[in-house]
Amino acid sequence: MSVIHPLQNLLTSRDGSLVFAIIKNCILSFKYQSPNHWEFAGKWSDDFDKIQESRNTTAKEQQGQSSENENENKKLKSNKGDSIKRTAAKVPSPGIGAPPIYSYIRNLRLTSDESRLIACADSDKSLLVFDVDKTSKNVLKLRKRFCFSKRPNAISIAEDDTTVIIADKFGDVYSIDINSIPEEKFTQEPILGHVSMLTDVHLIKDSDGHQFIITSDRDEHIKISHYPQCFIVDKWLFGHKHFVSSICCGKDYLLLSAGGDDKIFAWDWKTGKNLSTFDYSSLIKPYLNDQHLAPPRFQNENNDIIEFAVSKIIKSKNLPFVAFFVEATKCIIILEISEKQKGDLALKQIISFPYNVISLSAHNDEFQVTLDNKESSGVQKNFAKFIEYNLNENSFVVNNEKSNEFDSAIIQSVQGDSNLVTKKEEIYPLYNVSSLRKHGEHYS
């Protein structure tokens, strides 16, 4: 049975008039017009052929290896002293049995003037720069593609709207001027680094105008470095016992972090003090399922060891609330940040959904989630939910009318697209955060 591939992420413009959605290797654009009317505003697909690139690279390596083989033939002899010709290259061609290749699009960000959209493509480990033109039939136009040697994992945009900070899979951080001309071969040196995979990065400024880069990694570390003098480490934030998957910044001093621990951490990043922790383990327990059982080789005799991790934590822009979700669960948890007790966190609300949450984003005082709705029966729905703060009720509520109309817009926009309408077994892996957890084998 074919279904529309679930949405992997959402990003909304400041005024809410534009929404960008990721499905596989595509970015869909929608215009939002009140009340609850959506208009399809174009699609961009990453047509970079990673398989063909792999074949081309292999062919070049084989050609070079064949030349080396010819030179080495003089040195190779049989037991009888006869020359042996070796014409086969050492480098194998990709073929049957090779692992599947997934061309994810990640890390959607808008510049502050919203004239450009920045994203990352797994297909060629690149940073994508789009022009955003709301008057055009297709609002996105790819302008530049900066390729890296390692996959970009997280990005942050500087205030000048031209500098993008990129954290990669192998622990290096780079600074790119998106007005520059992309290099044919990546030669840039990193501005700072970790010894582990980077998971998040934020470029922030203190009240005195000094800039800092905050980075988190798989090794439980949060590092604060001066910018642009990134060789100067301001401080480390210690407290996590497992990987840090996501960080977010509040106003002034506040930093929030989460990951493989069963706690949310609140920090004063200026002083390095851990202000508070919020243990959510009892709250999430009813939402855990078989997907949270530890891998068989790390299980006990009763097969009841569970492992869970926060996939994303994000703060409301104007309100004292922060939301997060645990990977492969059907809820988001909203916490209130105390204004009296500095950095103190308290439960505000838990919002449940019919399917697992895939992504969480924020637009002003609205939270947005995308859902793993591949098991939806009948007409496919519940692609995303828009969650608004109701001042009168002092609580967050799902705007069902807006969400339902968005479902209809998604269905209409992908009709006839054989890439986005796919078999269930061909859906991209949607739960990758748990793979960051280290077990005994990583320390041996």
Curated annotation (Swiss-Prot):
Protein name: tRNA (guanine-N(7)-)-methyltransferase non-catalytic subunit TRM82
Coiled coil: none
Stretch list, region Disordered: 55-91
HAMAP family: TRM82
One of the GO biological process terms: tRNA (guanine-N7)-methylation
Phosphoserine PTM positions: 93
Localization per record: Nucleus
Organism: Saccharomyces cerevisiae (strain YJM789) (Baker's yeast)
Pathways involved: tRNA modification; N(7)-methylguanine-tRNA biosynthesis
PROSITE patterns: WD_REPEATS_2 (PS50082), WD_REPEATS_REGION (PS50294)
Primary role: Required for the formation of N(7)-methylguanine at position 46 (m7G46) in tRNA, a modification required to maintain stability of tRNAs; its absence resulting in tRNA decay. In the complex, it is required to stabilize and induce conformational changes of the catalytic subunit.
Primary location class: nucleus
